[in-house]
Amino acid sequence: MFTATVVSAFPPDDTAGSESVLRDPLLSFFSSIQSRHPEKLYLHLNQPYYGAGDTMWFKAYLTDAVSHRPDTLSNFIYVDLADRRGKIIAARKIKRDSLGFANCLPLPDTLPAGEYTLRAYTGWMLNFEPAFFFRRNINVGNTRSDRIRTDVTYTSAQAIVRFADADGRPIRDAEADYELFDRNGKRIEGVRQRTSATGALFVDLPHDSIRNGGYIRMKLDEGGTAFRRTLFLQPEAHDFAVQFFPEGGELVAGVPRLVAFKAERADGYPEDVRGSVLDSRGDTVVSFVAEHDGMGTFLLCPLQGETYRALCRAGEREIRATLPEVGEGACALTTAQAPGRILYKADGTVPPGSRLVGHIRGDCCCIVPVDPRRPAGTILTDSLPEGILHLLLADSTGRPRSERLVFLKRTGKRERWTVTPDKPRYGKRETVRAGIKLEDCGGKPVSADLSVSVTDRRAVRYDSLGDDIRTNLLLCSDIKGYVHNPGYYFRDDDPVREHRLDLVMMTNGWRRFKTRNLYEPEPFTPRHFIERGQYLSGKVIGIAGRAAPEASVSAVALNRENVADAAQADDSGRFVLSGLDFTDTVLFMQRIDMDGLYPRPPLTERPPFPDSAESVRKAVGDYLKQQKLQYATIDGAKVYELEGVEVAAENPRRPRSTAFGAVFDTTILSKFNPISLYNYISFLPTALYFEKKLWLSSRDGPGYVQAQLNIN
């Protein structure tokens, strides 16, 4: 095999070499990627699941997406929790402090049991694909909802919902209402029934597609108590799909090629399959079987002009899938990983002037000329960082002809954690002190920015195969596909695990940034800027619905001093108010001056809501059992959790309406203490204190006029 010399991307101490490097369009491409300052965000949660009324504590780790260093430009992050319909349940905007980003999301005790999506991002990350935001599916249980159990089964035309009490006895002859909605929230029908002798409610499904994202909203009257629940319909159990990925992306005629495959169910989970590859005559060419999480490989020697299809089976289910076509004039990379190096070879027709380019997270680490007569070589990896190495075979115009992902692991070079408590045993409510030590593989102390979660191991069970900060930064955040049980691939350096990790590399593509042409980076025009400080932004729209160009906008905080700013909108009516440094919740009053009609309130932009996905509920049920035990006695006193009731009455003290849409009484004003006299006056109707002046609403038209203030 021919061994190629790896070319350094940045020759040290060579001015002439540095100038030539800057002129290389390949390096200019990756320099352009790094200049966009991409970011990654990971949230360390105190628990993997929660009960209604819990507090979700977390610490966020924000890093540069290329170097994984924490010296990012953003000083604010956004965290929100949404249900499966996309409705935001709780949200926080968090400012960086001396310890980074740490905060919490209190969960309402009335939160229905179900699965929710936790999402975190920065304002700058909105300029990139939402697929690379931090996302995690969170299961939330509710001890009140647990008093009535629901179980759903499906027929070809119905969803059968059975109700039972906490002891499993069916709830018979109870009045129930349900509404059926499609995935877009459109109401399909509403029906009232009485439950059957088995406690069943029968919901007609008008068409198969309703099960893809549709849901049922139910209300059950049991003993004078209204029980409500929303159930999301599950996709057809027999639905699964199989994808095929030739190594290097192409089937080369006459060259044996390793073909990887991945089988997934409709809910995104892997499916174990087996099958056969058939040619155009229906003859079996090769058989295959999944070896790990629906993934596997087989060897295929394709023929020019031949077409191949696969017959795939999962249990009693069977589907047919088509393999990629045999490319005419195709070329494809083949790699083999060995300690400290990667062997590569390009099969097929290699264009003259081709180069092999390698990068890790956008940092170019090698550029190797590829000779079409001897298109093979070696890449040394000892000095490369851990993570996904993306190899691209680019022709003389910069167009990638073949790609391959390889994961680089630092075998046997793991840090060691040691936690030492000050006592072997502790009494009830006794303070626990523990020392935490982090050492490198050589036993030397290592400094770290860390967070620690302490939970009851009888109530909370962690999934050792799930996502953590290492798997997220090195693996999951750089590929767009779903990785099932990512922690499995990092438990040890077993060759079997490394082979299965390579299956993940072969069945997922690099998608953090586009590589259609390495000589011409796609233009990057950010729509959102980096949040170094806090700001308010929006758009001024006139009453006729048109934008209000060059309108003057000002805002002043009603419960903070020296928190105000003014700006002028641009030609499209958009504005930004900056320099607003505050914490906690702040109430702003805005003033808008413009020519023409009185404007509507400024519009503010919200990012798209996240989608939801799969979850596991058994651990949540065990956790709720522990919660019930905790509710039984608190400080030795027995506590009873009462059933929920509905109160159908009107509060006589609540004002029906006001001229200004809000009432500030002494109870509300006491929340803003301490408060200056000037800001106190701002709560008076028609009054506004801004820029050390008192303004009163003008009766002659919209806007404010300056008033004289005398205080005796």
Please tell me what each predicted stretch does.
Residues 68-70, 109-117, 209-215, 385-390, ...:
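Short glycine/proline/serine/threonine-rich loop/turn segments at secondary-structure transition edges
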Residues 76-78, 88-98, 188-198, 284-294, ...:
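Solvent-exposed serine/threonine-rich low-complexity stretches and specific carbohydrate-binding patches
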Residues 60, 90-107, 161, 193-205, ...:
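Glycine-centered loop-to-beta-strand initiation motif
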Residues 71-77, 173-175, 704:
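Short coil-to-beta strand junction motifs in C2/discoidin
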Residues 77-91, 177-192, 274-288, 358-365, ...:
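Short amphipathic beta-strand segments in non-cytosolic proteins
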Residues 1-24:
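Bacterial Sec-dependent N-terminal signal peptides
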Residues 32-36, 47, 51, 72, ...:
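Surface-exposed, low-complexity/disordered segments
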Residues 696-712:
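Periplasmic plug
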